[in-house]
Amino acid sequence: MKTNQLKLGLNFFSRFTRYLKPVTNPFRPPDNKKPVSSSSTKFVLSFDGGGVRGLAAAVFLKALEKETGFPISKHFDLFMGVSAGGLSASYLAFNQTSAEELEAFWSVDNLNLSMKRTFWDKALYFNNKPKYSNAPREALLKKHFSESFMDESAKPLALLAYDIERRTPLLMSSYGERRYRVFEAVMASSAAPLFYPTVKMESGEWLIDGGVVDNNPSLIAYVEAKKLFGADRIKVLSIGSGVNKKRIDGSASADWGPMGWLKNDVLGLLLESQMDHELLMALIREDYLRINSPMHSINADMDDSSDSNLKMIRYMGEMWWSQFGDDVKKFLEI
């Protein structure tokens, strides 16, 4: 039964990745080149989406940095992310920033700024509008990335979004044929429906959070690394954002309308697919390591930036290091 499920999954993924081919951009500089191929082992770091729970990955990676004495960028050849994970991937890859600095970026002040709500925001939310405005987080991202393009990234970087007009997933990368500004790509990849407005890119696309089609982009990251490097061996470290084990009352759900499903985290349900994990376990079991765990005392809401919730998210990241630290060092051949 499981073999048939994996075959169906592989068939679905082969059709899904057809839509990830870059579109030619006449404005791309002709001298921009892809990284040189190599037959050596290449390491990929992939981040799930998960809103404020992205802090846990930063805490975990800071522990890895402390253990090795090197910034995270020194250990990986490709960074991949979706939604909040796209922010983490971009932050680490673009300027080879340390995980300690990434953790600082996930501060309460920055979170509250990116999720700032005015009186009118609240009024519009109850009038069927997005919960937050894009303006505050755009200002925050521009402060760090300025107007830079993805192809200026110090390390290969890829983010997943979804093109709502073409109804296709879209991969934005530092090595593709179309150029994207980093702040725009991060905003688009994390424009979660209900929370943020659709993002109109400078190149014309209307994009939303890529997590609506794949909240664990590790399999896409593996495929991209194979195409990009041509390496004999690709190793993927995939970092999640916690697993929601809260029971849903099946009989009660039969009577839920739109508000009932929203109240019971329908978006979270859509983002919990384990397909990528199962496929990678079948394809490259020894070269794939997944960091994740159930959420204990953590609010599953993606925008709960309360002190108590962030404290528990930070604790989850610390527990990941206690549980997976030795495995990660062995995996990275440190």
Residue positions per predicted region:
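Active-site gating loop/helix substructures
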Residues: D151-K227, M259
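Surface cap/lid and interfacial helix-loop subdomains adjacent to catalytic sites
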Residues: P130-K155, D249-L279
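C-terminal helical/tail subdomains of lipid-metabolizing enzymes
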Residues: K2, L6-F16, S37-S40, P197, ...
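Non-catalytic, mobile gating and regulatory segments of ester bond hydrolases
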Residues: L8-K42, E103, S107
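Patatin-like phospholipase
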Residues: K42-S46, G51-L141, R181-V186
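Extended hydrophobic secondary-structure segments that form protein cores and membrane-embedded regions
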Residues: V44-F47, D77-S83, L157-A161, K235-K246, ...
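Conserved small-residue
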Residues: G50, G85, L141, L159, ...
